[in-house]
């Protein structure tokens, strides 16, 4: 049975491509989006509605409350179990998302040390003293590669990366495997790309649409459900900016524009992260996406069959 990854920056059309491919293959979809895990975070994460999923089974959507936290190990365990279960029913799996570390956790064996309470306490105290931006700058200097994989606004993950560096004496990314997947060696990855101008415009349009659909009201509803209690969910793009607006720190117009700016920056980091993985086959905007992926899958299947003759 197949395991296919559809990855790329935000707003490149990954979800639509994944659904078209899953319908063609009769496959099921697993989300690799760290914020679509949360119930109620629909508008701000561009989560597809049930109707938009077009009858295709989706997994790892709406599985956590906003006050709960997830990590890479948590995601890895659940995603791998789901893949095995779906394959046991003789169905292919399409993984789709832009959280690069989650995708890597599915495919590869990541070896991170357990949390050290004293190191964590020290880093938390330092963060309170110098602030999140300074902590991220510290990470950029110690491990630029890790800074690409982690959202600058997600202080919890920034601190975790710094903790791994301090415990191991090695860069956070040194714990990531460099060779081909040891867990799913036959997995195939396809990356979607767009030119910068087009992608920036799509991001701007998407944020405007989120505001029109009611992102501000959705955020207020989530705040009443404990959004501030979750260390991860409250930092999600869009929601973090609306929280600042709700607290009177910025205007609504500034919140909207800052969401666009932060999303563009996040897209750049996603592009750089995925570009480092030589296993990804890139599909340009001029190529018909579904047909190109299907052609690659057929060619790969023929090659494997020939090798086993």
Language-model region placement:
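Phosphate/pyrophosphate-binding catalytic cores of soluble transferases and nucleic-acid-acting enzymes
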Residues: 1-309
């Amino acid at each position: 049975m197949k395991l296919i990854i559809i990855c790329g920056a935000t707003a490149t059309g990954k979800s639509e491509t994944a659904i078209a491919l899953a319908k063609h293959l009769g496959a099921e979809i697993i989300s690799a989006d760290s914020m679509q895990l949360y119930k109620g975070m629909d508008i701000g994460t561009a989560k597809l509605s049930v109707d938009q999923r077009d009858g295709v089974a989706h997994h790892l959507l709406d599985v956590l409350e906003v006050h709960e936290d997830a990590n890479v190990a948590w995601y890895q365990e659940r995603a791998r179990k789901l893949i095995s279960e779906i394959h046991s029913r003789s169905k292919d799996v399409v993984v789709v998302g832009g959280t690069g570390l989650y995708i890597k956790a599915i495919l590869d064996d990541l070896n991170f040390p357990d949390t050290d309470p004293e190191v964590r306490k020290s880093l938390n105290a330092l963060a309170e003293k110098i602030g999140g931006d300074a902590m991220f700058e510290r990470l950029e200097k110690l491990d630029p590669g890790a800074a690409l994989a982690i959202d600058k606004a997600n202080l919890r993950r920034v601190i975790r990366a710094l903790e791994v560096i301090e415990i191991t004496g090695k860069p956070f990314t040194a714990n990531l495997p460099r060779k081909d997947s040891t867990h799913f060696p036959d997995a195939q990855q396809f990356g979607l790309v767009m030119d910068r101008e087009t992608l920036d415009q799509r991001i701007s349009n998407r944020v405007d649409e989120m505001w029109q659909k009611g992102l501000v009201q959705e955020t207020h509803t989530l705040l009443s459900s404990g959004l501030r209690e979750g260390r991860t969910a409250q930092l999600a793009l869009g929601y973090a900016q609306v929280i600042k607006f709700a607290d009177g720190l910025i205007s609504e117009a500034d919140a909207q524009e800052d969401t666009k700016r932060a999303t563009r920056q996040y897209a750049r980091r996603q592009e750089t992260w995925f570009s480092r993985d030589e296993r990804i086959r890139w599909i340009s905007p001029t190529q018909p996406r579904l047909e190109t992926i299907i052609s690659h899958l057929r060619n790969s299947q023929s090659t494997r069959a020939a090798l086993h003759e």
